[in-house]
Amino acid sequence: MIQIEALPAFSDNYIWLLQDTAKRRCAVVDPGDAGPVERWLAANPEWVLSDILVTHHHNDHVGGVERLRQLTGARVCGPANERIPGRDLALDEGDRVDVLGVTFQVMAVPGHTLGHIAFFSDQPATPILFSGDTLFAAGCGRMFEGTPEQMQPALARLAALPEQTQVYCAHEYTLSNLRFAKAVEPTNPHVQQRFEDVTRLRAENRISLPSTIGLERLTNPFLRTAETLVKQKADEWKGHSNNSHVAVFAALRSWKDTF
């Protein structure tokens, strides 16, 4: 059985720690800083770090990779089309990778970066998704390299995963994302309830993750481009009609960039 724990890093990053409690083996996702992982391993000396999964090349996701690889000999698995330090296994759309006895499907999800990948598995009792900086709780990543024509379909693919899928994204952006979601859909009761719930969690310094695909479908404006009110708000922002899901998404993303 795999357990998943968040190791906070920097101001708002989460390094996800996967633990095989039976074999005392673990893996991490997007270790932008080696420190939190080193401290956990030092406190749990009987555990072995076997794998490092990377979603994209930004330094706050790969900054600790080489040191951890040198310290532990862990296998580094990352996107084939990006420069990932110490990468041992290059992964692209349709590939599969076994980690701690769990098989993950690799999904190409370009937009935030061109080579960005996500890791999905439906083998655990509850499916799990490591979405990096593509899909956030109630939001999505900025398009630093890709285009709306790439990112909107990528998000739609993630939204089509089973609704019970637990979403482990890489940043604690949920509250600010929900403020934007409220501006887009001020009458959406699910958004309002989630905003209240997350406000309480963060006031207690508690993590707001994981999310679920089902909850994202109800509250994430970037997955709700087919909703009439969402389109109307996007049209108001742009000053003209947006006649495709991609156009609505692009309008929302440009609005969020300045929100």
From Swiss-Prot:
Classification via InterPro entries: Clx_II_MBL, Glyoxalase_II_hydrolase, HAGH_C, Hydroxyacylglutathione_Hdrlase, Metallo-B-lactamas, RibonucZ/Hydroxyglut_hydro
Cofactor descriptive note: Binds 2 Zn(2+) ions per subunit.
One example of a Gene Ontology biological process annotation: methylglyoxal catabolic process to D-lactate via S-lactoyl-glutathione
MF GO annotations: hydroxyacylglutathione hydrolase activity; metal ion binding
Catalytic activity: an S-(2-hydroxyacyl)glutathione + H2O = a 2-hydroxy carboxylate + glutathione + H(+)
Binding sites annotated in the UniProt record for Zn(2+) 2: 60-61, 133, 171
Residues holding Zn(2+) 1: 56, 58, 112, 133
Cofactor(s), names only, from the UniProt record: Zn(2+)
UniProt key word Zinc: yes
Family the entry assigns: Belongs to the metallo-beta-lactamase superfamily. Glyoxalase II family.
Complex formation: Monomer.
Function comment: Thiolesterase that catalyzes the hydrolysis of S-D-lactoyl-glutathione to form glutathione and D-lactic acid.
The protein's name in its UniProt record: Hydroxyacylglutathione hydrolase
